[in-house]
C-alpha cells in the first residue's frame, strides 16, 4: 500500500472506532506499519482537515485519536437532532431494544455478547430516540454503564409496566427467542 492508501484506511478506522477512538499503537499493529509512519499520517490528516475547511477534525485525548465534527458547525448538528425523525429504526436497533427490554439492566458488552456484534451505534440510536437510558454502573471491573428502557419506551409501545411485555417461553432456543421479540417489535418498525 502507498501512503495515500494508508491514509484512507486510517481515516476509515478512525470513523469505525466511533466514540471509543483508537491509539496510534493500535493503528500501527492493524496496518503492520511503524508507529512513526502512523503518527506522520495522523498529522497529515489533521492538517488536511484544518486546511480544507472540512466538517470533521481529528482530536487526541489521552493518546486516543477520534474523528469528530467541528464545533463551529454545532448549530447544524443540533437542527438535525431536533428535526422530526422520519427514518425507520434499523434491525440492529430493534434487536438491541428487545434485548434491553427483556434483560435490563444490561451493559453494552452484555448486549454485544448476546448479539454477537458490536452494538455501540444501535445503543446510541435508542438513547437519541429516548427509548433507553443509562441507569447506573455495574459493580464490576471497569464499572460499565447499565442501560434500561425509558418511560418513553413504555408510552410508545402502549405498556403500563414492563410486566406487560409479552412473556418469553421458558427453554426456548435463541433463534426462536429472537423471532418472538422481532414479532413484538415488528409492528412498530414503521413508526419508530
UniProtKB/Swiss-Prot annotation:
Instruction: Recite the UniProt keywords alphabetically.
Output: Cell cycle, Cell division, Chromosome partition, Cytoplasm
Q: Which Pfam families match?
A: SMC_ScpB (PF04079)
* Membrane-spanning parts: none
Per the record, the similarity remark reads: Belongs to the ScpB family.
Q: Which HAMAP family match?
A: ScpB
Q: What does this protein do?
A: Participates in chromosomal partition during cell division. May act via the formation of a condensin-like complex containing Smc and ScpA that pull DNA away from mid-cell into both cell halves.
This chain's protein is named: Segregation and condensation protein B
Amino acid at each position: 500500500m502507498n501512503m495515500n492508501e494508508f491514509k484512507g484506511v486510517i481515516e476509515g478506522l478512525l470513523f469505525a472506532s466511533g466514540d471509543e477512538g483508537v491509539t496510534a499503537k493500535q493503528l500501527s499493529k492493524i496496518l503492520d506499519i511503524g508507529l512513526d509512519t502512523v503518527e506522520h499520517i495522523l498529522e497529515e490528516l489533521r492538517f488536511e482537515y484544518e486546511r480544507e475547511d472540512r466538517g470533521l477534525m481529528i482530536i487526541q485525548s489521552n493518546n486516543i485519536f477520534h474523528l469528530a465534527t467541528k464545533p463551529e458547525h454545532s448549530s447544524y448538528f443540533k437542527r438535525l437532532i431536533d428535526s422530526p425523525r422520519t427514518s425507520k429504526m434499523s434491525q440492529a436497533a430493534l434487536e438491541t431494544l428487545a434485548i434491553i427490554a427483556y434483560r435490563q439492566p444490561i451493559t453494552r458488552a452484555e448486549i454485544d455478547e448476546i448479539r454477537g456484534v458490536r452494538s455501540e451505534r444501535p445503543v446510541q440510536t435508542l438513547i437519541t430516540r429516548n427509548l433507553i437510558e443509562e441507569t447506573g454502573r455495574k459493580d464490576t471491573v471497569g464499572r460499565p454503564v447499565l442501560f434500561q428502557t425509558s418511560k418513553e419506551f413504555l408510552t410508545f409501545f402502549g405498556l403500563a409496566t414492563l410486566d406487560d411485555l409479552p412473556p418469553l417461553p421458558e427453554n426456548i432456543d435463541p433463534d426462536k427467542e429472537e423471532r418472538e421479540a422481532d414479532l413484538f417489535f415488528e409492528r412498530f418498525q414503521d413508526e419508530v
